[in-house]
Amino acid sequence: KTGNAWLGILVAMGARSDVLEEAQGVLEQYRASLAKAMDYVSRPGVMEELNNIVVLKGGDVIDERQVSSIASIISSSGLLPTSKPLIAFAQAGNMVKISARATKQLVEKGLNLGALLSRLSAEYGGKGGGHNIAAGAEIPSDRIIRFLADLDRAVGEQLAKNVGAGGG
């Protein structure tokens, strides 16, 4: 997630001294970046609750390479309603990187984030997919508002369909 996988490989192979020192520096920077992102998340207006989803607007503050980590941390924190999945996004050039997390209870009610993000991101000129409980996508940044509205509606429809079928 930092673009420095080679450092981890060298340390795992037994390299020490300068390599280990550099790896520790990268780890410290990564932790500081995560802490900054978590501080940002606690600000008013960064999280927005829609009808069926909770949106985390990472903008250009949350690093696109960390949006999935931040989404996982927040979704497991117990601070969000368990009745709605978290949809986090961050700017990635002219694209937006999206990371979605659901609760086990939502998956049991029929929510499949991987299927929804795969279908919707393709409709918006992007790509996406994943698992029922955790998924990701990338779409053009100028389409994010409409995408989130459609995703909010689609999550509601998917959950309602399963409840209507006696699954919830």
Stretch-by-stretch model annotation:
Residues 1, 21, 52-168:
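Glycine-rich, acidic loop segments that terminate in or are immediately followed by a histidine
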Residues 1-57:
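Acidic catalytic cores of enzymes that act on phosphate-bearing nucleotides/polynucleotides
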